[in-house]
């Protein structure tokens, strides 16, 4: 009896071992399958980006041609330039007017993307050391000159850029099903006035709004909204609208299905000019979902406008470029301790001397800085007025022809 019992126990143990072996085998197969799936997905994503990459208008910029001020190096951050071209013809090189100039900083430690719009009429030193409006750099020398202008004046370390034609923005909005935005009565009135022009350039139908309210804007409406300028707040308020549209697109884009994203890529990539290599695009694509969109600002923080400077015409003048750059770095790179370079100090002094605009001694940059929630458009309406020692020295000169004319969107 004991012998039979031992035999049964032995068989039970052997059966248990066999079951365990089968389970381990299945588990190993499952693990291998899971790894294969992950690799397949990764390879698919890589293959997807590689297949689409050649659709970009790729512009290679020699790193030796990029100028970076001495001592400027950003550890833990990647900073890129984003330009919005208004050629509306798909031509995105020199000769293109850039209504939108945005510095985008990726904070790798915190996983945050911060944006700063550079007001297009800001008087800055150009790549050739002359002075003109910020958007003149791209117009006269293309993306390389624009990057160098940003690096030199703002102590940035920008190596790459992307330029998007306005038609591309219209297409993206429509392909994502529109973006929900609250529009004021004055904005609706101006939008209705110019949406036809935008729709015609995009080869789409124009739809007007019924006054102010919350709307799901279509492509032409969203682009027109982002470009409205001749309203209270002028270009300052316009940059806020641009950043809002980008934020709304980002929020919808990260929720889009792969089919929609595929269509967007096929449609949009040909309307994008960039210096990013395939390796860099793959790296950005792989990490994109892990970043959240943070705050945005307009630059310069303290400024005065209506200053006529030679051929630049009616320009926005920073009230102390050096102080504004210091505040910009506090915003874009909060973990960095920054002292502005001697180059920025020199440019800051030159702008003050050339325009006769002096920063008030009692102005505190940090206290004066406003976020989008506090309406950046009102920054220069404060009690610390700029001291203009001689505002008429260049008032008789004609305005530059590098800016578009006419229309509330210009």
Q: Model-predicted segments: where are they?
A:
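C-terminal solvent-exposed extensions
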Residues: 58, 70, 273-397, 402-410
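Extracytoplasmic/secreted envelope proteins and their assembly/folding machinery
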Residues: 100, 131, 143-151, 166-170, ...
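Flexible, polar/acidic helix-loop-strand segments at domain edges
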Residues: 74-76, 174-260, 409-410
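Extracytoplasmic
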Residues: 75-78, 96-101, 110-118, 129, ...
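Soluble non-cytosolic domains of exported or imported proteins
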Residues: 97-98, 128, 137-144, 163-167, ...
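Second-shell loop/turn segments in exported
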Residues: 89-92, 132-140, 155-160, 212, ...
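Amphipathic, coiled-coil-like alpha-helical scaffolding segments used for oligomerization/assembly
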Residues: 140-204, 277
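Entry/capping segment at the start of metal-dependent catalytic domains
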Residues: 2-111, 315
């Amino acid at each position: 009896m004991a012998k039979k019992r031992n035999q049964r126990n032995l068989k039970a143990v052997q059966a248990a071992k066999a079951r365990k072996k089968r389970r381990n085998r299945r588990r190993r197969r499952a693990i291998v399958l899971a790894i294969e799936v992950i690799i397949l997905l990764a390879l698919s994503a890589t293959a997807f980006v590689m297949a689409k990459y050649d659709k970009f208008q790729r512009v290679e910029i020699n790193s030796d041609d990029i100028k970076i001020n001495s001592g400027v190096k950003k550890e833990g951050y990647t900073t890129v330039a984003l330009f919005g071209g208004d050629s509306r013809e798909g031509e995105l090189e020199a000769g293109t007017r850039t209504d939108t100039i945005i510095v985008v900083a990726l904070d790798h430690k915190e996983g945050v993307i911060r944006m700063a719009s550079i007001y297009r009429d800001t008087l800055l030193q150009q790549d050739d050391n002359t002075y003109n409006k910020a958007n003149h750099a791209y117009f006269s020398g293309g993306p390389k000159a624009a990057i160098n202008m940003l690096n030199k004046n703002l102590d940035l370390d920008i190596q790459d850029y992307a330029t998007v034609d306005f038609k591309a923005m219209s297409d993206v909005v429509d392909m994502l099903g529109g973006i929900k935005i609250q529009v004021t009565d004055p904005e609706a009135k101006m939008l209705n006035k110019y949406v036809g022009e935008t729709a015609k350039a995009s080869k789409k139908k124009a739809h007007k709004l019924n006054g102010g309210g919350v709307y799901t804007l279509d492509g032409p409406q969203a682009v027109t909204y982002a470009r409205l300028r001749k309203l209270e707040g002028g270009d300052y308020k316009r940059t806020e609208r641009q950043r809002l549209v980008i934020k709304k697109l980002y929020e919808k884009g990260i929720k889009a299905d792969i089919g929609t994203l595929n269509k967007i890529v096929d449609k949009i990539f040909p309307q994008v000019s960039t210096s990013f290599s395939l390796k860099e695009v793959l790296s950005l694509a792989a990490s994109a979902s892990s970043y959240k969109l943070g705050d945005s600002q307009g630059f310069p923080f303290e400024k005065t406008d209506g200053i006529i400077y030679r051929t630049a015409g009616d320009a926005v003048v920073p009230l102390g470029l050096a102080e504004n750059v210091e505040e910009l770095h506090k915003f874009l790179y909060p973990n960095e301790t920054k002292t502005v370079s001697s180059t920025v100090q020199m440019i800051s002094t030159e702008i003050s001397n050339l325009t006769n605009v002096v920063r008030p001694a009692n102005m505190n940059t940090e206290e004066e800085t406003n976020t989008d929630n506090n309406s950046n458009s009102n920054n220069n309406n404060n009690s610390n007025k700029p001291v203009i020692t001689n505002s008429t020295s260049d008032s008789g000169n004609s305005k530059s022809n590098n800016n578009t004319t006419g229309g509330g969107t210009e």
